[in-house]
């Protein structure tokens, strides 16, 4: 193997060892392109070419990193001597390298500077700028989410404490029930004058999230006052749905104060929903996942995961400090996940799915019947109040007025009246259909717990387990939020029999079809196959997967 050397400056009569020009880097390095080819490599063109290019770029990059000053001349001299010592070897021993020098076009110092700064430092600066921008956005949402949690948390806690006071006061003063029609007139008057377009429905917050339109601030005091009045005078409604409106309206206005874009206001609204739900019920994980998956079923906005979770955690922390205890139960009967028990749970989940369809349709039909019989909202709310007061007097119990938390606890302990779930559905439909305000989720818990307590022994399951499964699975079937339902089971029941809860929720979700508690809830994917769905003539039907697309907002 012969090494060949050709030096431009040797032809000019100068020695590279003893004479280093001022522009030494340009003279010594940039005039020559060299490569080292290991003899032990196989004679494969690709491998040899790769070795050539690798050493070539390594040398030029190392040379370019040296500063341009005369003090570095000895370094170049040493490098030159090392190379020159290798050149006289006409035949390289085994394992040695043959050095081949060939003249190429000159590389000036600007080229080296571009390699050093343009490639390396440029990439570093780009990475640092990208990381700084990314961290700035994360910090922004952490601060905003914390602010929302600190604002919505006390409001949610105050709302929950006010509802507890209202139910306790009504229980101590039964005569308040007969003032329910008058309370209904006040509620209709407030909404007709201060929020004629909103109506105080949970669907309002769904539209706000989907269309990037923050709700008005007056929604918060209206839903607060009207829901407390409904509970105080004996209406049958919940609180979580109202909490979604309360938190969503306040957090949306916070976004407007900071002049956020509509898309950012959407995320702020979701943070408020999670914070208020968590503050009321004490389940931050379920509140976060519920907010992400309930608006558009099949599409979760994971960008809202961290902000919503921060708001939810702060909400439950503040509400606990204010004295509002989180909901939690102890499951007194545990069942092993044997094949027979799994079949029993599947059957119970199917029954709960059918019940969820019936409950949703009942709540949607009641307002239509009221409108057909009573033409004005004032007549409707008075008629509803009279009907509820009459039924309560006829039954001789107030178990079906208000939220019914005591009945839920009794059902989870294994005691429930067989027809209690039917009466609760009737009372809730009469209350909300007439124009009274409140949520639907606690009545769902009541209905599911009492139904499960009655149906479980017929299937061979303990009534305590049946009530717990019914409470969670009916919530899943009505709201179409399976992940939030499983999280709810973990937080409320401490993770006991979680596999059975997950199975019941999955069955209820799949068999409940496209019925929903909320009219503004959209479905993006089929429950049975991996295809999209679209609304045709008011019904959700499957569409061809090839033609199914979603926009940036997750809508079809």
In which residue ranges do the predicted regions lie?
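Short, positively charged low-complexity motifs
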Residues: 1, 13, 26, 31-33, ...
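Extreme N-terminal basic, low-complexity initiation segments
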Residues: 2-9, 17
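Residues in intrinsically disordered, low-complexity segments of regulatory proteins
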Residues: 6, 31-34, 43, 140, ...
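Intrinsically disordered, low-complexity cationic segments
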Residues: 8, 23, 38, 42, ...
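Intrinsically disordered, low-complexity segments enriched in serine/threonine/proline/glycine
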Residues: 18, 36-40, 53, 100
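Cationic, low-complexity basic patches in intrinsically disordered or flexible, solvent-exposed regions
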Residues: 54-57, 112
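Alpha-helical transmembrane segments and immediately membrane-proximal extracytoplasmic
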Residues: 95, 103, 107-556
């Amino acid at each position: 193997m012969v090494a060949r050397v050709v030096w431009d400056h040797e032809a000019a009569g100068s020695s590279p060892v003893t004479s280093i020009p001022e522009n030494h880097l340009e003279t010594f390095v940039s005039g020559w392109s060299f490569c080292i080819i290991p003899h032990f490599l196989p004679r494969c063109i690709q491998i040899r070419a790769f070795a050539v290019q690798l050493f070539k770029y390594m040398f030029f990059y190392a040379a370019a990193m040296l500063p341009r000053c005369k003090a570095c001349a000895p370094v170049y001299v040493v490098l030159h001597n090392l190379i020159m010592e290798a050149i006289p070897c006409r035949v390289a021993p085994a394992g040695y390298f043959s050095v081949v020098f060939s003249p190429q076009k000159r590389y000036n110092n600007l080229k080296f500077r571009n390699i050093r700064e343009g490639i390396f430092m440029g990439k570093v600066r780009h990475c640092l700028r990208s990381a700084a921008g990314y961290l700035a956005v994360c910090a922004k949402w952490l601060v905003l989410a914390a602010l929302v949690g600190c604002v919505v948390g006390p409001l949610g806690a105050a709302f929950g404490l006010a509802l507890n006071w209202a139910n306790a006061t009504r229980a101590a003063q039964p005569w308040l029930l007969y003032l329910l029609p008058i309370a209904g007139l006040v509620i209709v008057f407030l909404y007709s004058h201060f929020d004629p377009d909103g109506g105080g429905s949970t669907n309002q917050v769904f539209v706000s999230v989907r269309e990037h339109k923050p709700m008005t601030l007056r929604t918060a005091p209206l839903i607060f006052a009207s829901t407390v009045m409904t509970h105080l005078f004996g209406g049958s409604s919940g609180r979580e749905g109202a909490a979604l409106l309360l938190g969503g309206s306040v957090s949306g206005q916070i976004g407007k104060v900071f002049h956020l874009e509509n898309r950012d206001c959407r995320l702020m609204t979701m943070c408020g929903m999670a914070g208020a739900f968590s503050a009321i019920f004490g389940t931050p994980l379920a509140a976060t996942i519920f907010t992400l998956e309930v608006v558009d079923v099949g599409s979760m906005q994971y960008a809202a995961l961290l902000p919503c979770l921060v708001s939810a955690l702060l909400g439950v922390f503040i509400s606990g400090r204010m004295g509002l205890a989180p909901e939690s139960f102890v499951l007194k009967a545990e069942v092993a996940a044997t094949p027979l028990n799994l079949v029993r749970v599947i059957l119970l989940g199917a029954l709960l799915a059918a019940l969820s369809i019936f409950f949703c349709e009942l709540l949607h039909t009641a307002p239509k019947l009221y409108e057909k019989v009573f033409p004005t909202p004032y007549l409707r709310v008075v008629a509803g109040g009279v009907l509820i007061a009459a039924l309560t007097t006829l039954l001789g119990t107030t178990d079906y007025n208000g939220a019914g938390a005591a009945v839920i606890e009794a059902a989870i302990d294994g005691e429930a009246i067989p027809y209690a779930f039917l009466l609760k559905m009737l009372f809730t439909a009469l209350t909300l259909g007439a124009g009274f305000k409140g949520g639907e989720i606690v009545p769902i818990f009541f209905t599911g717990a009492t139904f499960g307590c009655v149906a479980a022994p017929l299937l061979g399951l303990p009534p305590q387990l049946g009530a717990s499964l019914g409470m969670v699975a009916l919530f899943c079937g009505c709201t179409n939020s399976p992940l939030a339902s499983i999280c709810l089971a973990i937080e409320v029941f401490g993770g006991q029999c979680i596999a059975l809860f997950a199975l019941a929720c999955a069955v209820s979700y799949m068999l409940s079809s496209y019925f929903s508690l909320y009219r503004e809830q959209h479905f993006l994917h089929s429950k049975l196959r991996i295809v999209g769905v679209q609304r045709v003539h008011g019904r959700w039907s499957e569409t061809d997967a090839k033609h199914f697309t979603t926009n940036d907002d997750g809508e079809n």
